[in-house]
């Protein structure tokens, strides 16, 4: 599920201050196509319960990066090597989670830091169906106009259920000034420097409910994690998808968490 919500900023001064926070301070796919089976072997399907799914990326043999708002329970499954949700596939590796590590500065109200690491009970068997998606070497921002891709098993339109098969859509990074203007999010919520907006200004190309946690790849580099959008309005040009940027501080947290885990 890509989270969909609205939040009211108390004043313009608060909004401006949030936009200027330095980086060192603490969905089915809409408008896309089914991918060639197992052509995105880093994709992870998270079966949270019988009614809820998320996605993620395998970033080490026993580590998955997803969104913090994806709520797991003891029966939640981490499925590697999947193309279809329902079909039995010999490529699938089904695992359980040993421990969850939500980003310590995650704020559910603003969705800042909507990231979570999942340490798996066992290591994945790496093959042509299951591979690691490497983190970017630098936590650089992504320039407006950059072409990106996002994949997932989420909704294909707002009244649909999940897609049974993995789909992907091409989307474009949109300037934060545009995403925050009165014709788009209007600072509700604030799209800050540790987030990026991506979609189409004409609408119709987006991530959606069920795609939360999916990796955002821009020019082949892992740049963000699917977070939220307008409630029940996936693909609406007024609310492009919002992704948590893999900024320097987020990358440092990921690296230190993995190194420090037992």
UniProtKB/Swiss-Prot annotation:
Annotated EC: 3.4.21.78
Domain Peptidase S1: 29-259
Annotated GO MF terms: protein homodimerization activity; serine-type endopeptidase activity
Keywords in alphabetical order: Cytolysis, Disulfide bond, Glycoprotein, Hydrolase, Protease, Secreted, Serine protease, Signal, Zymogen
Reactions listed under catalytic activity: Hydrolysis of proteins, including fibronectin, type IV collagen and nucleolin. Preferential cleavage: -Arg-|-Xaa-, -Lys-|-Xaa- >> -Phe-|-Xaa- in small molecule substrates
Quaternary organization: Homodimer; disulfide-linked. Interacts with APEX1.
Designated name of the protein: Granzyme A
């Amino acid at each position: 599920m890509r989270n969909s919500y609205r939040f009211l900023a108390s004043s313009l001064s608060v909004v401006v201050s949030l936009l200027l926070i330095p980086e060192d301070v603490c969905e089915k796919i809409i408008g896309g196509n089914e991918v060639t089976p197992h052509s995105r072997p880093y994709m992870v399907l998270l079966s949270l319960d019988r009614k809820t799914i998320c996605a993620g990326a395998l970033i080490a043999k026993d580590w998955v990066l997803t969104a913090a708002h994806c709520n797991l329970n003891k029966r939640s499954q981490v499925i590697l090597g999947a193309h279809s949700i329902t079909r039995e596939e010999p490529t699938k590796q089904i695992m359980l989670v040993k421990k969850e590590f939500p980003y310590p500065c995650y704020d559910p109200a603003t969705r800042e830091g909507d990231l979570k690491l999942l340490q798996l009970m066992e290591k994945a068997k790496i093959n042509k169906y299951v591979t690691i998606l490497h983190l970017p070497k630098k936590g650089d921002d992504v320039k407006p106009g950059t072409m990106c891709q996002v994949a997932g098993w989420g909704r294909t339109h707002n009244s649909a259920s999940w897609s049974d098969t993995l789909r992907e859509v091409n989307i474009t990074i949109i300037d934060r000034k545009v995403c925050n203007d009165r014709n788009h999010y209007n600072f509700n919520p604030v799209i800050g420097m540790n987030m990026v907006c991506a979609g189409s200004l004409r609408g119709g190309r987006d991530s959606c409910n069920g795609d939360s946690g999916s990796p955002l790849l821009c020019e082949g580099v892992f740049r963000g994690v699917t977070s939220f959008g307008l409630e029940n309005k996936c693909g609406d040009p007024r609310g492009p998808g919002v992704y948590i940027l893999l900024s320097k501080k987020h990358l440092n947290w990921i690296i230190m968490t993995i190194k420090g885990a037992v």
